[in-house]
Amino acid sequence: PRPSPPRRAGAGPDGRPSPLGAAPARLAPMRRAVCPGSFDPLHKGHVEVIARAANLFEEVVVAVSSNPAKTYRFSVDERIAMIEATVSSLAGVAVRPMGPGLLAEFCRQIGADAIVKGLRGGADLEFEAPMAAMNRHLTGVETVYLPADARYTHVSSSLIKEVHGLGGDVAEFVPAAVLRGLDGGA
């Protein structure tokens, strides 16, 4: 067989021009990801996304955010303790407070390659896409979306707090450490 002619710059594997013009740069492997959130409280949907991220990246930093303009059920330290108790068996996962600054800046400070976000549906994507674009613009950090497990597409921290506050059983949707916290235990 005849050797293939060299590929022209901007050409696809078949030699035709790429629809993107010049061939896109090959991305370096992503090693450290941030799973950000307020996690007030952490629920099993969050845990499932964190566990999947731990299978995709060498390191995952669960960044616990705090906005001074918001009221939280649990302090940052309480949220961190509940998350650590839940994810302690996952290799390569660390939990850190993020503070009130930009997520993009936090990613730059810790050398993160990616932000991992779970999506429950289209509304989540509409909310997350502009933030992902801004984070990429500010630091070049890519956002990786993981679709939520079907068991948890209806679960949110706000709904957990509301249902629990009205006496409903949320044990199926939160880790044991969170249930103890919601019930007033440590």
Residue ranges of model-derived segments:
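Compositionally biased, low-complexity flexible segments
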Residues: P1-R26
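Nucleotidyltransferase catalytic core that binds NTPs
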Residues: P24-A186
